[in-house]
Structure formats: C-alpha cells, structure tokens
Regions:
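Short strand-connecting beta-turns/loops that link adjacent beta-strands
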Residues: 34, 144, 157, 216-217
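Catalytic core of non-heme Fe(II) oxygenases with the double-stranded beta-helix
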Residues: 104-199
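Catalytic core of Fe(II)/2-oxoglutarate
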Residues: 162-166, 171-253
Length: 253
C-alpha cells in the first residue's frame, strides 16, 4: 500500500471517502497500491490465468432472468474469466492485502460502518476478473450495497468502467434505465478512472454500470474484495457454479 499517500488511520481521508460515497455512491482512490505491489499481483494473476473459469451469462440489468415488462425484459450478456480466492497463494501480495486487518478497518471507516467482516465464501471472498479481447460486462445493478475493487491492469483499449449514478429508486427510474440502455442518456453516464493501483468503493445497487468491450491483446485485470456487515456471508451454490464452475471440495452439484 502507498502509506505515504494514504495513511490508513487518517480520519480526514476516510471522512472524505465517506462523504463521496454518500453523495455520489462511488469513491476512487488512485495510487492506493504501489506499482511494485501491482507488478507482483499481475505476475501471480498471469501465472494462474489458465485456472480461471470462463462464463457468459445472460440476464437483465437487475441480474435476474429477462422476463416481465419494461427493462426487466431486456436481455444482456457478459463474458469474462474469474480466478477464485483459493487459487491465490496465502502468502502472496493479493491475499495478504485482503486479509490485512488495517485494510479491513480502513474500508469500514470509508463506508461509515461500525462493523465489517470479510466474506466466508471460499471462492468469492477475493476474486480477480480477467477480461480479454471481445469480453464485456454489460449494464447492470449490483445485488449488494457496496463493492470494493482494485484495478490491476488496463486493456489496450476499451474496458472503461461506465457509471450511471443513482438512477435507481426514483419514480421514473425505469424510463431512465431504458434511456441509458438505448444510449440516449449520455449526460447521466460518466467514466470512473480505474488506472492500475486504484482502490474503488462503489454502491452499485442504485447505480447502473458496465465495463465496455475489451479490445487488444492485453487483458483487463480487476480484483474484487468482498465484505459484509454480517459475519459468515457466503454465496449460493448456483452462483458458485455460474461464476467459478465448481463447488467446494466434497460437494456435488
């Protein structure tokens, strides 16, 4: 971590981050991870990449099956590969970062929470998305209140994180969502800077977002760090099979 720039116990930093989250639903902290640490993590991801599970789910913007009326009936698709928590070296840079209590408490204060726990999911507590040429993560809302991510490597072209902030929960949200999906509401969309080393806190439950199609031979790597206010949080077997292609050892689908 770049402790010269981000002192983890500095209340002015965490207070400013909390204010940005409350106002905009997103907080971007560039250069949070040092270049040396990013290089170490990228080397590990590249070595592990053959183990990643590729998926191409189809769903609507609310991450459910496309059915019903209006924007709930719009079918979108994703394509990406994912490395799971148990792929990574317990002594490696990325797992050490996720399992660091100082980082946990820094994130907790940035989110304005009294309590925060790491996920108990053996695959999804920490995972890395790998997006290659032609891959996309189309428009969607998250099912959780916040996502914590670290940008590791940018694609040659594309791979922008586009955010239509705070459009859910209003009386006309379906019309706004439809306009964004059509490309008719560019004034509502902004690109969040995700340069390597950036830590981003994001409330995707109310903000629709996407990753634009990847172009070129350099894949996009992003680490996702999973936390919850409740202890012992795990994902469903269905999600594990969809995202990681397997269940924990000894369990059958």
């Amino acid at each position: 971590m770049n402790l010269a720039r981000y002192r983890l116990n500095d209340e002015s930093i965490t207070s400013r981050a909390f204010a940005e989250m409350r106002t905009n639903g997103v907080c971007v902290l560039p250069g949070f991870i040092t270049n040396e640490a990013i290089a170490d993590i990228v080397r590990e991801v590249e070595a592990l990449a053959p183990l990643a599970h590729r998926s191409a789910p189809r769903r609507n913007p609310y991450l459910t099956a496309a059915k019903g009326a209006n924007t709930h009936a719009v079918e979108l698709h994703d394509s990406l590969e994912v490395l799971a928590y148990d792929h990574f070296d317990p002594e490696g840079t990325l797992r050490s970062l996720y399992e660091c209590d100082d980082v946990l408490h820094f994130v907790r204060r940035c989110l304005g929470l009294d309590v925060l726990h790491r996920y108990a999911d053996p695959f999804g507590a920490l995972n890395v998305s790998i997006m290659r040429d032609g891959d996309v993560l189309d428009w969607h809302f998250d099912m959780t209140d916040f996502v914590v991510s670290i940008a590791l490597q940018s694609a040659e072209s594309g791979g922008d994180f586009e955010n239509a902030a705070n459009i859910r929960g209003n009386d006309n949200d379906d019309q706004v969502v439809a306009a964004v999906l059509r490309g008719d509401a560019q004034e509502r969309v902004r690109i969040e800077p995700m340069t390597p080393g950036t830590l981003m806190l994001f409330n995707g439950r109310h903000s629709m977002h996407r990753v634009t199609p990847i172009k070129g031979m350099t894949p996009r790597f992003v680490a996702l760090l999973a936390y919850d206010t409740k202890p012992g949080t795990d994902s469903t077997d269905a999600l594990k099979l969809s995202r990681y292609g397997r269940l924990p050892s000894g369990r059958l689908a």
